[in-house]
A protein has these predicted regions:
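Alpha-helical assembly-interface signal, strongest on the long, hydrophobic N-terminal helix that forms
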Residues: 1-70
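Residue-level signature of catalytic and energy-coupling elements of molecular machines
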Residues: 9, 31, 72, 99, ...
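Proline-rich low-complexity regions
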Residues: 21, 106, 137-139
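Short amphipathic secondary-structure patches
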Residues: 36, 40, 50-108, 130
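N-linked glycosylation sequons
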Residues: 88-95, 116-317
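Flexible, membrane-facing loop/turn or short amphipathic-helix motifs
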Residues: 108-116
Length: 317
């Protein structure tokens, strides 16, 4: 088939236009992909910022804002750090932090159409709630005596002069709770639970078997190993400082169940009932006792309503 010159010209023009359109759509697809990637990265950044900010609510709103801004800056959108201002952090209520982030994304090929950049946004809300069940508990249960923050507390009694201790109960307990499996007894398991914490979850209302005896040797071994994991950390009167771990995550911050001091194990009684959960910075031995400092801790676990000093944070938007 032969084409006239004008037909050949028309085909050439059509082919050129088609190629330009295809290239334009391909270019736009690249920019759209860039925008979608940026949106996902920004959302991840504001999520992390909200969670970090909600942890700061344990102290006050100023700390929440500081942590939120700091965490945002540790994230990037298309290799650029996320900039968050204090005016982008708000508080829907006393336990929630809302983050409204935005970021300007430079485009590549859309500049041909006169579009040089787009502004994307992301919103996240996180709340600080009460944890009523968690794992990682140490094998001690102590009487709830209503300590103020920073108070020294006996975590493991060394003799019967401690509150509600007796010749067969020095605050030592076995895991798992009754009804969740057979409680595992013995010195080596008890020692390992001091070092690493329980693998099972302990919740308010659980009934826990008492480990009889003073367990002097296993206690000393376990406490020594645990302190050795973060030996430089210490309590400065307000918080844990000089830790080798990020804030609030030293292994020496231990979680312990509480029981009613008026409902303690008398000689012959083999269980305690968990009425609350709390956390302490492990100091070490003081005389025959093992001591800690009462403090609040953010941890993972089951959220709910109950008598617990453990806090958790989660996204709700």
């Amino acid at each position: 088939m032969k084409f006239h010159k004008n037909e050949k010209g028309s085909i050439l023009v059509f082919s050129t236009v088609t190629m330009v359109v295809v290239l334009l759509f391909a270019s736009l697809a690249i920019d759209v992909g860039c925008i979608l990637t940026a949106r996902n990265q920004l959302q991840s950044a504001v999520d992390a910022s909200a969670l970090s900010g909600s942890i700061g609510l344990i102290i006050d709103r100023s700390e929440a804002i500081h942590r939120a801004i700091l965490m945002a800056g540790m994230n990037t959108v298309i290799d650029q750090p996320v900039a968050l201002g204090a005016d982008q952090v708000s508080f829907p209520n006393s336990s929630q932090v809302r983050i409204e982030g935005n970021h300007n994304v430079n485009l590549f090929f859309s500049k041909i159409a006169g579009i040089h950049s787009v502004n994307i946004s992301g919103v996240a809300v996180a709340e600080l709630g009460t944890i009523i069940g968690t794992n990682g508990m140490r094998p001690w249960a102590i009487p709830d005596l209503g300590w103020p923050s920073g108070s020294p507390v006996v975590l493991k009694a060394g003799d019967i002069n401690a509150d509600s201790a007796n010749p067969s109960f020095y605050y030592c307990i076995d895991f798992p709770p009754i009804g969740s499996g057979s409680p595992v007894t013995g010195a080596s398991v008890y020692r390992d639970n001091i070092i690493y914490g329980s693998s099972c979850e302990i919740s308010i209302g659980d009934v826990i078997q008492v480990e009889p005896g003073n367990m002097v040797g296993p206690t000393a071994q376990g406490v020594s190993d645990l302190i050795g994991m973060d030996a430089s950390a210490y309590w400065n009167g307000k918080k844990v400082v000089n830790s080798a771990y990020p804030a609030n995550s030293s292994p020496r911050i231990v979680k312990i169940p509480l029981y009613d001091p008026y409902d303690y194990p008398h000689p012959g009684r083999k269980t305690i009932t968990v009425i609350g959960l709390a956390s302490f910075f492990l100091m070490g031995g003081h005389g025959k006792d093992i001591m800690g400092v009462y403090m609040e801790k953010v941890t993972s676990g089951t959220f709910g309503e109950g008598y617990s000093f453990l806090k958790g944070t989660r996204l709700i938007l």
